[in-house]
């Protein structure tokens, strides 16, 4: 088994075939594949991953400052904290700053789409709509 070191996981940024985001090629010592990332107004980060690991690979990190919604299209492995099996069509939500550790199995493509939503954006949005909801509720109550 090999453990991924975040400072050498991506070896280069590759030419982007579309005008948005950045493509990264992974280090051949871990496998083959790429990751595409696009940040939208500092509120959302969208990532598409297509990687095939060479051997059992452990990945560990902390989730960023926002909520992450991940759809695993294909893949095989195990996540810890809490334990969950990674298999095709798995949908997972990670909390901000959640500890993350997973083991991915080799030669099975890990295809995943994630959307990270900034916590501050969520808080601001909920505050805005709660004020609107209070005004609507108050108006509705007065009318009856």
Q: What are the language-model segments listed below?
A:
Residues 139-144:
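Conserved small/polar residues in nucleotide/adenosyl-binding loops
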Residues 1-15:
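Short Lys/Arg-enriched alpha/beta "domain-start" segment
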Residues 18-24:
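OB/S1-fold single-stranded nucleic-acid-binding modules
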Residues 25-137:
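N-terminal regulatory/effector-sensing and dimerization cores
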């Amino acid at each position: 088994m090999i453990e991924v070191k975040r400072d050498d996981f991506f070896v280069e940024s590759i030419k982007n075939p579309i005008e948005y985001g950045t493509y990264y090629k992974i280090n051949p010592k871990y496998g083959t594949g790429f990751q595409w990332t696009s940040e939208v107004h500092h509120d959302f980060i969208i990532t598409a991953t297509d990687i095939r690991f060479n051997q059992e690979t452990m990945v560990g990190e902390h989730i960023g400052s926002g909520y992450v919604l991940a759809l695993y299209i294909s893949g095989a492995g195990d996540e810890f904290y809490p334990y969950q099996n990674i298999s095709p069509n798995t949908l997972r939500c990670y909390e901000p700053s959640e500890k993350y550790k997973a083991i991915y199995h080799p030669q099975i493509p890990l295809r995943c789409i994630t959307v990270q939503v900034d916590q501050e954006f969520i808080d601001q949005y909920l505050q805005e709509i709660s004020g609107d909801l209070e005004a609507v509720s108050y108006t509705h109550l007065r009318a009856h």
